[in-house]
Regions:
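Nucleotide-activated donor-binding/catalytic signature segment of Leloir-type glycosyltransferases, i.e.
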Residues: 206-226
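Short hydrophobic beta-strand element within catalytic cores of glycosyltransferases
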Residues: 237, 261-264
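A short, histidine- and acid-enriched strand-loop-helix "catalytic/donor-clamping" loop
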Residues: 36-37, 86-103, 117-118, 151
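A short, active-site helix/loop in glycosyltransferases that binds the activated sugar's phosphate group
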Residues: 114-141, 148-150, 207
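Membrane-proximal helix-turn-helix segments that form the acceptor-binding/catalytic region
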Residues: 53, 79-83, 102-121
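Acidic donor-binding loop of glycosyltransferase active sites
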Residues: 233-247
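A charged, aromatic-enriched C-terminal amphipathic alpha-helix characteristic of glycosyltransferases
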Residues: 297-328
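Conserved donor-binding/catalytic core segment of Leloir-type glycosyltransferases
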Residues: 160-179, 197
Length: 329
């Protein structure tokens, strides 16, 4: 694309934003965020607002993409658009319409969505929710799932120590409130033939160092990108947990990238995307050990399913991104 594109995010890590920027040829700028304490978070939001507007004035983009969880990021784009010729594409995180769509942010969200040219939404279930609960924007909604990430070329399958004779699973986590990691670990204590690595900064869950390793699991803490991909590449299967609807999990896309068997929470949104190609965990009400056994017994079949699904989803995504580009050029 010959237009000047910029993609701005305010978060800690957003593989979606980074990957989407690459595919679009957009300059990607992530200003970060602060979650706690509340006063510091509010101050950070205000600072990021002015930094973002200043970026727009310096770069003079023709198309602005915002990773829209909080409305202030797209407000900066909407104000810039008022005085400059450009298009605004708000990439809506589910928090935008599930967590921040209430007083006092509801009216601000509606105003900036009205000013935006396109509202990217991450899956069809979210599109249905949006149309049913927030009417008036159906003409602006464009469904675009995450691109399946490219695995770094230097990443090789790595032997995972301490797990001889066991099948290895990687539970990908950020220890968010919607991820029932601790109940999961409690339930796998009786499963003898598996070993689980759990990624992510577990200090957010107030886990003590003595709880960071058990007989058949180990919490890795936060890993840099290379070590993270090496861990995933060395696993027999990948696990992703959520109790939250209307979200597709990064771990699911990463499992597709590596063509790894996937155990994932059973939500309508995830079922709509992955169909019958993965093993579903019934929100921890079912038999976790049995679900793992199902994958272990049919590892080759699940891997073949993921390989085929990857081809289908890549082709679908290529068609969608072409459609998006045609809308903004």
């Amino acid at each position: 694309m010959k237009q000047r594109l910029i993609f701005v995010a305010w978060n800690q890590i957003s593989r979606r934003s980074a990957e989407l920027s690459k595919r679009l040829g957009a300059e990607y700028i992530n200003l970060g965020r602060v979650d706690r304490p509340t006063l510091k978070r509010l101050f950070n939001l205000v600072v990021n607002f002015f930094r973002t507007y200043s970026l727009f004035r310096d770069r003079r983009p023709e198309v602005i993409f915002t990773f829209h969880a909080h409305p202030l990021i797209t407000l900066a784009a909407a104000i810039y658009k008022k005085f400059n010729r450009c298009q605004v594409v708000a990439d809506l995180h589910s928090a935008a319409y599930l967590d921040h769509y209430r007083f006092p942010l509801k009216s601000l969200n509606r105003w900036v969505w009205k000013k935006a040219d396109i509202l990217l939404i991450h899956n069809r279930m979210s599109q249905n929710y949006f149309n049913q609960n927030i009417p008036g924007y159906s003409g602006k909604l464009f469904v675009l799932e995450d691109p399946i990430p490219a695995v770094p070329v230097h990443i090789r399958k790595k032997y995972l120590y301490g797990v001889k004779g066991k099948f290895v699973g990687i539970l990908v986590s950020r220890f968010s409130d919607d991820e029932p990691v601790l109940p999961f670990l409690e339930q796998i204590k009786e499963v003898n033939n598996i070993y689980i690595y759990v990624t992510g900064n577990y200090t957010k869950a107030r886990i003590t160092p003595d709880q960071a390793e058990g007989e058949n699991y180990r919490l890795t803490g936060f890993l840099d990108d290379d070590k993270y991909w090496e861990l995933l590449a060395g696993a027999d299967f990948i696990i992703a947990l959520t109790t939250r609807e209307y979200t597709l999990l990064s771990a699911g896309y990463e499992a597709l990238a590596l063509e790894k068997p996937l155990l994932i929470s059973d939500t309508d949104t995830l079922r709509e995307y992955f169909q019958e190609n993965v093993e579903y965990l019934d929100r921890l009400t079912g038999d976790i050990g049995k679900s793992m056994e199902n994958v272990i017994v049919d590892l080759d079949d699940y891997q073949r399913n993921m390989s085929q699904l990857k081809q289908v989803k890549n082709a679908e995504w290529d068609t969608k991104i072409t459609g998006l580009i045609n809308k903004i050029v």
